[in-house]
Regions:
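N-terminal topogenic membrane-targeting module
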Residues: 17-36
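Alpha-helix boundary/N-cap detector
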Residues: 15, 19, 59, 63, ...
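Polar/charged, Gly/Pro-rich intrinsically disordered segments
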Residues: 83-131
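A short interface-forming secondary-structure element
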Residues: 48-63
Length: 131
């Protein structure tokens, strides 16, 4: 899916790397705009957290999330012809906003991650924390 090759080497009867951990670490390294990423195995969902270092109105956030969803739907429509599920929540803490974006792992692609981070960078510019 992401083009990463998983190694399944045994060391003393144990697997040396776990593919899920490798995937999460790779996402954080390849996309420094992602502050943290969490995987929920039960729901097969990824939650990506982004930090914006300025106050953002609810109206502005809702407009951006709508634009993000439309962009992802268009991207996946062109790539696979399928609609995808997206959920977003935001937490405001003074002059800082934490944006949580949830997606199903099975339909997520590397191109989609690039699109998400590019749209966030375009919208929030220097205020988007890059780690």
């Amino acid at each position: 899916m992401f083009g990463f090759k998983w190694k399944n080497q045994q060391a003393g009867g144990r697997q040396t790397t776990q593919p899920g951990i490798q995937l999460l670490a790779s996402m954080l390294v390849c996309y420094p705009e992602i502050e943290s990423v969490t995987y929920e195995p039960k729901d097969t969902e990824l939650t990506m957290d982004f930090i914006v270092s300025r106050a953002v109105s609810q109206q502005e956030l809702e407009g951006f999330v709508k634009f993000l969803d439309e962009s992802l739907q268009t991207y996946h429509s062109l790539e696979t012809g399928q609609a995808v599920w997206l959920a977003a929540e935001a937490e405001a803490h003074g002059e800082t906003v934490l944006l949580h974006i949830r997606r199903q792992l099975q339909t997520m692609t590397r191109g989609e991650l690039t699109l998400i981070t590019a749209l966030l960078s375009d919208k929030f510019g220097e205020q988007l924390k890059v780690d």
